[in-house]
Amino acid sequence: MRIERSFLGAEGVGETIERRLWEQGVTHWEEFDRACEGVGPTRAERIESFIEGGRRAIDADDVSYFDRAFPTGARWRLYESFREQACFFDIETTGLDQRSSVVTTVSLHRDGETETLVRGDDLTRESLEAAFEDAGLLVTFNGARFDVPFLREAFGIDLDHPHIDLMPTCRKIGLSGGLSAVEHELGIGRELPDVDGREAVRLWREHERGADGALERLIEYNREDTENMVPVMETVVDRLDRELLPAGARPDAD
């Protein structure tokens, strides 16, 4: 969904009012008029203010304006208009406890390219800050509860960027479970279907003991986690668009 189709960011506009506008044929900012039925003068003024600020934000590539305006559950709407700023990332660790476990690899995918940082080599606070510096929008799977706080604890970095967490977003269309389960449901394949989080821990331990190929396999798994979030994101956004928007306003009607 293009940002210009959203009215949800205006103060006093919830999903009910937004849908009412869409059903009247007001499916784009350009089509909004103060005379729209069921809006009222105060709310109309707020919508116009949101649209004015939104246009400036789009011109400035400012994702944060909409991140502040939208409720958490609507952040998936940021993707279509700001996909070029999206940085997909995933971490591997030696366990779930942030205090007793360590981060072993971090993979970041942006602009069609993937970079992996490895513990003991180039995985440092400075390299992470540099990697995330130009990211306007973060995309993770369960990152709000795991990846982001883990990196904060391990490296002292605050990733306060606009952030789409795919796990709760997938639930909106009935997809539950971990990333691999979602991929399977969507028909997205893997080169390493037999590797999971537990195997990733074992691979790191083997690497520490000097086993040939263990690190390479771990990196491949981490990169696959990261890169596969792209088709998941694309599919989920498309389905949510089709569920929410009236037929004439859907992407295939543009």
Ranges and model annotations:
Residues 1-83:
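N-terminal accessory regions of nucleic-acid-interacting proteins
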Residues 75-78, 93-97, 127-128:
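Catalytic micro-motifs at enzyme active sites that drive phosphoryl/nucleotidyl and oxygen chemistry
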Residues 84-95, 222:
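Two-metal-ion RNase H-like nuclease active-site motif
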Residues 90-92, 147, 165, 225:
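Acidic active-site catalytic centers that drive phospho-/nucleotidyl reactions
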Residues 93, 113-119, 214:
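Surface-exposed cleft-lining segments at the edges of enzyme active sites
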Residues 98-102:
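Short glycine/proline-enriched turns and hinge-like loops at secondary-structure junctions
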Residues 105-108, 114-189:
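Conserved DEDDh/DEDDy metal-dependent 3′-5′ exonuclease domain
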Residues 185-253:
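Acidic, Mg2+-coordinating catalytic module of metal-dependent nucleases/exonucleases
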